[in-house]
Amino acid sequence: FWKTKHINNIFISTPSIIGIVYLILVMNQVFLIDLYLSDYVIIFISYSIIATVFFSMILGHWYLNVIQLPIKLLKNSIILLSFLLIIRLFWNIYALTTFELTDNYGINLSLFSFLWTFEGFLLLVAIFFGLIVPIILNVFIWYTLQIQSTQSATGLIYVSVVSLLFGDLFYKYYAFRFGIIV
């Protein structure tokens, strides 16, 4: 199966299709909640980032086993991931400069000020592991793909998966705990 000389698009596309179906199922549950349109967009972007990094990881594995795959496919998935991370970066900058919340002591704080409190520290961790580290890794992945080293790129994508999952875990904590969708 892995040693085949021909590319079977069904096996490459199936994980993506399953991911899209689950994304639609999750988004249907999210639409039951009364949120602003911008909140729905950033939730969709967040899930899309996770789906894209997993797709890139699976695609990277195919490059390890099927030599004939054009490297352009993996480059395109990394470009898409970079684009989604840039959107999240702009959203986080917007949120940090404009959002306010009330902490446990009843004090209104800007989100940027909240980062430097005891309760807000993990949001800083979420931004670091869920945004800054993946952006830096994407630069490394891109240059690794430029030298046609798909094995190294796949390893870096693995690190990006772990970083994004770790960051997303903390993002979700703040969404549930404080109602902050960042």
Question: What positions do the PLM features span?
Answer:
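Long, hydrophobic, amphipathic alpha-helical segments used as structural scaffolds
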Residues: 95-98, 152, 174-177
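Long, contiguous internal "core" modules enriched in hydrophobic/ aromatic residues
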Residues: 1-134
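Interfacial loop-to-transmembrane junctions
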Residues: 142-163
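Juxtamembrane boundary at the C-terminal end of a transmembrane helix
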Residues: 168-182
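Hydrophobic alpha-helical membrane segments
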Residues: 128-141, 161
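Aromatic-anchored segments of alpha-helical transmembrane domains
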Residues: 20-24, 162-169
